Amino acid sequence: MNANNSPEDDGSSLAPETKEPCPTKLPPSLRNELKARAASLAPPRTLEEVFSEALGAWAEEPEEPNTPPVKLTGSIPFTTMLPAGQWSLHKKVCSARGVTFAQGAARAVRRWLEDHPEAWTVRHPGKIRRIIVCNQKGGVGKTTVSQGMGQAAAEGAAYLDEVLTLLKRNSLKNKELIERIEQAEASELRVLLIDYDPQAHLTKQLGLEVLPAKGPSLAKAMLGHLEGSLADLVVPLTDARFGGRLHVLPACRDAFLLDAGLAGHRSRSHALETALKPLENDYDVMIIDAPPSLGLSMDAALHYGRRRDGESKGQSGCIIVVQAEDSSADAYDLLLEQIQDLMKDSGVPIELLGLVVNLYDASRGYIATSSLEGWQTMEEIRCVGVVPDLKEVREAVRLRIPLFTHDPVSLQAIELRTTWKEIS
């Protein structure tokens, strides 16, 4: 045994050309933080790469006496591929230091995170924007708009420059689109997308797993039944264009029962705010993909999106998504009535940040074109975006990846960047 509490080299060198599985467990929060930190590096690195590096560094360097253990409560299975022999070496180091294999892995990850601090932080501390994307009608594309604005808010400057370069190289060279990207600014904000809809469209469309009904969830946090931290459920999206800044709070099927639970809750209008408040200091923007509902859960979302004392106008509020057809107008009227009733009953200001017309197709004729004109000339709310009905969003949904990952130069992606700029 050497002075570093690591076993002597027994001649079994690691073989980087071959890989073997490493079965262990990590707390979800630690795994997610490692994944996000890896994606935020320049150039971005994979979870497999940084985990291997963390184990290697921990094996080579001694631990301080009385190093506190990492809490492994709620750990879940975690398997990745390591260079052949590295996991065996890790087990020897753990045995020498008197810790379990999982505890050793967690300590290695913790040390790596400490040695590789975040290169960016919340840009506007204390000024969290809370945006509720809503409509009582289902199928209008609230999820498309929610995740599109989130992607636009988190996108890195280098990737926006790349979009501009690609547009200029395009043989068509659409001057209007080029000008719009030239006028856009990469926000590079830290964003949390919250799937508040029990149908879990946002979660599934981004390739994430829906939370199990009997496990921890946002609904349980709202009802005061959550054991642990809501932060442990947050999942980072690892596409390098978002720099580790875009996170998702997945949906859970138990949200179908949320309205019934809120009916007997003493502070039901504050329930969502109470649940999400501990996360606010970690983000610049929270975007809530709301369900097609006029129930108590929607009341809680609208209350959360109100303008708080001291907040500037336009900082938080509602984005209403519609289509260029008559049934969307009926649903809009119902939602507007709910918002007005809530403001009257509670005395809180709820701002209408804008209207987004989604799935627009002028080829559908007079109904579509006249409806669009009606939306664009409304007095009580301004139209901040018109997203066309094109194949790229459907392709991204089928592939279960973000639209900006699938086709960052698509007209839909450009329109969603414009929408975000309009409300920024």
Identify the role of each PLM range.
Residues N2-A15, E20-C22, N32, A36, ...:
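P-loop NTP-binding core
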